[in-house]
Structure formats: structure tokens, C-alpha cells
């Protein structure tokens, strides 16, 4: 595995990320959520992609792609491991979204290329990174109140918003993926909340990927 070459690719790709709002439809008609996981001891990469109507946030389509894992887990290079399955799930969708929430980092990455940015560049779609853990940067401690907010900073640059979406829950790290500004990324996540820690697009993607009770109930109620 030539990490020097991958690192150079990351730096080059990151320079192409658009950090301002370039949505083709604003507000969007369809918002997608994407979640990647691994099965069979990491040998299979599974990507779930869901489509929600906006503003109702009604689930209208979901696809799950499973492909052979092409790369081992290497911290800092996760997007190379995850994007092939995301592309496979993307190709399965019968209609394409105007905005994608990706479970993972956007520019809040040491070389500014998390999976949300990498995927957004590959398919040229506006993306937002919604991550559950910090990868780099620093932020001031948040109060315990829901809605507490602080910028995630690294070398004088804001990479994300750290936002406590729900009381007694760890905060989310919300970042530009591609073609969405950091402030708009936060605003879109806030518009897509329904009382859970995660916004609806990534909550549904996780539910589909892991066959959680919410998804089991949904499928049971389908004609």
C-alpha cells in the first residue's frame, strides 16, 4: 500500500473541494443519507443510501450495496476504503438527490478529505459530513444543553461545527463535504432533525444498513 501516493491524492483532491454553496436546487427536493459499514470480518463493505423528500423527510427509496473490500483499515485513509461501496449504492438509486448527508467527515480531516468530501467530488454532488467523533482539530468545551455549539478549529481554520443535537448525547461534527458551506451544512442538519441525535438522512441510512427496529417497522408497513 503506497501511502505516500494516497496522501498526495488526498491533498490534490482536497484542493478541488468547493467550500461554498453550489446547490443546483435550493431548497432541495430530495436529500440522501449515506452510511458505510463492514461485514464478514471486514471482507465485505456495505453501503446504505436512502432518499428522503424535503421538507417532509419522508423515506421514499433505499438501496444497500455490498462489495468486496478493496483496502485494509488505515487511519486517515478511510475514504479510499469506503467510497467504492458508496458509488455502487449511488448507481442503484432510481433518482438522484440534490444533497447528500454522509455518515463521516468532510473537510474535518487532517488533509481536508474525509469520505463526504471524497464522495462529493467523485459524483459532483453537494455533500455534508456528519461525524460522531473528532478526527482532528480542537474546540472549546460545550455546555450540556442541547443546541450547544462551538467551531472546530485547526491551524486557525474552521473545519466544522461541533453541535450537541440532543441532551445527554455526545455532539456531532458537521462539516462541508463539497459544494456546501460550513454554516449551511449546520443549517441543513438542523432542518432535518426530528428529536434524535442524528439528522433523519443519516439516521435512516444507519437504520437501513443495520436493520434497526425503525426500518423493520417501515418495511412491515409497506404494501
UniProtKB/Swiss-Prot annotation:
Activity response to pH changes: Optimum pH is 7.0-7.5.
Compartments, as annotated in UniProt: Cytoplasm
Signal peptide positions on this chain: none
An annotated Gene Ontology molecular function: magnesium ion binding
Organism: Escherichia coli (strain K12)
Listed name of the protein: Endonuclease V
Site (Interaction with target DNA): 73
Reactions listed under catalytic activity: Endonucleolytic cleavage at apurinic or apyrimidinic sites to products with a 5'-phosphate
Purpose of the protein: DNA repair enzyme involved in the repair of deaminated bases. Selectively cleaves double-stranded DNA at the second phosphodiester bond 3' to a deoxyinosine leaving behind the intact lesion on the nicked DNA. Has a wide substrate spectrum. In addition to deoxyinosine-containing DNA, the enzyme cleaves DNA containing urea residues, AP sites, base mismatches, insertion/deletion mismatches, flaps, and pseudo-Y structures. Participates in the excision repair of hypoxanthine and xanthine (deaminated adenine and guanine) in DNA.
